[in-house]
Amino acid sequence: MKMIVGLGNPGQKYAGSKHNMGFMVVDGLAKRLNLTIDKLEFDAATATTRLNGEKIFLVKPQTFMNASGRAVRELMMFYQIQLDEIFVVQDDMDLTLGKLRLRKRGSAGGHNGIKDIISATGSDEFCRLKIGIQHPQRQRVVDWVLTPFSKTDQPLIDDAIEKADDALEDWLNGMPFDQLMNKFN
């Protein structure tokens, strides 16, 4: 069993915002797999399929970013998903725009959605795919993450989403995480 969790904020108000990179990536993967993420369960929108004989969950928590842990924990408990079967997709202000970074574990690094998942699960031992949204120059962080990408930045973001979905597909198809890091970091 594998679960891919895209972090973001629900609702049209936040659609396309920098903080919703996780949602955008999971939506792209769902499209590749001909899935619709529309089942509401455990404070999350989900889709399930089977790939290579394994059950796959695509998840978009509907609790707002800073409370994502509850949905992740409840899905883990109900479906008996282990931490090493989870891959969380997030935005990262400390990475240059469009850069991907994969990590096996680690601290939240200031990301409140990750912090809440660590708190809810009691562990930081889950895989992450971080996508750079760049740090704001003079703008307040909260305003920066909740605004959409500029038209000039959008092609770079579209490319990053494609690469992120390539990485997730490779993981779903059994590529070892160390190889994923070598290929996509």
Swiss-Prot record:
Major localization class: cytoplasm
CDD domains: PTH
Domain of life per record: Bacteria
Site feature (Discriminates between blocked and unblocked aminoacyl-tRNA) residues: N9
Site entry: Stabilizes the basic form of H active site to accept a proton: D91
Localization per record: Cytoplasm
InterPro entries: Pept_tRNA_hydro (IPR001328), Pept_tRNA_hydro_CS (IPR018171), Pept_tRNA_hydro_sf (IPR036416)
Catalytic residues, chain numbering: H19 (proton acceptor)
Catalytic activity entry: an N-acyl-L-alpha-aminoacyl-tRNA + H2O = an N-acyl-L-amino acid + a tRNA + H(+)
GO CC term, one of those recorded: cytoplasm
Residues that hold tRNA according to the record: Y14, F64, N66, N112
Record EC number: 3.1.1.29
Gene3D superfamilies listed in its UniProt record: Peptidyl-tRNA hydrolase
Enzyme class label: hydrolase
Keywords carried by this UniProt record: Cytoplasm, Hydrolase, RNA-binding, tRNA-binding
Recorded GO MF terms: peptidyl-tRNA hydrolase activity; tRNA binding
GO BP annotations listed: protein quality control for misfolded or incompletely synthesized proteins; rescue of stalled ribosome
Database matches in PANTHER family: PEPTIDYL-TRNA HYDROLASE
Function: Hydrolyzes ribosome-free peptidyl-tRNAs (with 1 or more amino acids incorporated), which drop off the ribosome during protein synthesis, or as a result of ribosome stalling. Catalyzes the release of premature peptidyl moieties from peptidyl-tRNA molecules trapped in stalled 50S ribosomal subunits, and thus maintains levels of free tRNAs and 50S ribosomes.
Binding partners and assembly: Monomer.
Family as reported in the entry's similarity comment: Belongs to the PTH family.
HAMAP family: Pept_tRNA_hydro_bact
Protein name listed in UniProt: Peptidyl-tRNA hydrolase
Originating species: Lacticaseibacillus casei (strain BL23)
Gene: pth
